[in-house]
Amino acid sequence: MTVIKKGKNKKKNLKNDDRYKELDSLITNGSEIGDNSGRSCIKRFFKIIGNEMKNNVYVYFLSILYLCVCVMNKVFAKRTLNKMGNYSFVTSETHNIICIVVFQLLYFIYRKTSTSGYKNESQKNFGWQFFLISLLDASTVIISMIGLTRTTGNIQSFIMQLIIPVNMYFCFMFLGYRYHLFNYLGAFIILITIAVVETFLSFETQSENSIIFNLIMISALIPLSFSNMTREVVFKKHKINILRLNAMVVLFQFFTSLLVLPVYNIPFLKEIYMPFSEMSTNINNGLRCLFYGQNTVVENCGVGMVKMCDNCEGAWKTFITFSFFNICDNLLACYIIDKFSTMTYTIVSCIQGPAITIAYYFKFLAGDAVRKPRILDFLTLFGYLFGTIIYRIGNIILEKKKMVKSQNSNDSEAELTCIETSTA
């Protein structure tokens, strides 16, 4: 039986090893290439990319799908903000209620159609994990709201992409991740692309920008990173269902979002500043704006003013569309973290920056927020994609080493078992 098991392991390892042959050829024979070294190296490089995409069609399809959903989520979030930006608390809590209903309904259907999986999960209590994720998400929102008040658009984009090194560091420290040189190189290329582009765009940056508030916004990446890592631990260690996680987290989030209320009473927050005495009036006006399309703030508002002008006509359509894509975004993000890792999710999501910018070129997507195309945006997207490819090559090499190590371990155990059997 041991010999048969050993044969199966060899067959499996040989099958898995096929995808790495081209990579081995590129690395091993790199020094043996003659006059056509450059052309041969490029040819091999693109052949590796082709084989990688062919062997991981599902991964790349899922990544593209998530990227499209994520872009639509951000675009319609911006369009919702343009219509009813004075009522962020109303939109936040209404969206939470919609998410509670949808996720609870989906999880109810899952329980009815998959009884065995539900029974296995129902024996475990994940209350503190749900509360921790909700609290981390609420903390991210609160800190980001404070930082955003004096952090201009271009700097916002740069700061959000810093999640790559932040996630790499915390995954290294707490989840035991180990990286290849190509992982660092890919992340470095992405960061350099961001730095160059944002430096170039800094000439367009508004004067109202504070380094203190920039640092506050950067600190929001810490709870965001820990939230993603907690999700990964819950998925990988406890094998919890994605629908159950989202159903419970959004339920906790409805209450943890109330922690945001004191933030609205901080005077230096300018646009979102709102005393507690005006809270009930704001909620009432927000509900009228969302469900009845009634404008309340129409005077002393607009560009350069403290408040935005209401544009509530058709607000509910834009808001429902945003909620739909946001729910899909959450499900796909959790699925990617569950099936792959936090870093895979981070690298895929970082491409959304230039993709969102390009989406604003199309009026049917961006509406009133449409912008003119710029070559710089396409160059940024190319830099992101190139860095992502280099990062993925690092993962391939690490997978190869892990597979070889596992193969050697299986062979050693099989040989030891055979020796013990023959001795007996």
From Swiss-Prot:
It is found in: Vacuole membrane. GO terms for biological process: amino acid transport. The chain crosses the membrane at residues 57-77, 89-109, 126-146, 157-177, 181-201, 210-230, 249-269, 318-338, 347-367, 378-398. GO terms for cellular component: vacuolar membrane. Glycans are attached at residue 86. The keyword Transferase does not apply. It is a multi-pass membrane protein. Residues 78-88, 147-156, 202-209, 270-317, 368-377 are vacuolar. GO terms for molecular function: xenobiotic transmembrane transporter activity. The keyword Transmembrane helix applies. Pfam families: CRT-like. It comes from the Eukaryota. Disulfide bonds join 289-312, 301-309. Residues 1-56, 110-125, 178-180, 231-248, 339-346, 399-424 are cytoplasmic. Its main location: membrane. InterPro entries: CRT-like, Transprt_Chloroquine. Keywords: Amino-acid transport, Disulfide bond, Glycoprotein, Membrane, Transmembrane, Transmembrane helix, Transport, Vacuole. Nutrient transporter. Involved in maintaining the osmotic homeostasis of the digestive vacuole. Belongs to the CRT-like transporter family. This is Putative chloroquine resistance transporter. The lineage of its organism: Eukaryota, Sar, Alveolata, Apicomplexa, Aconoidasida.
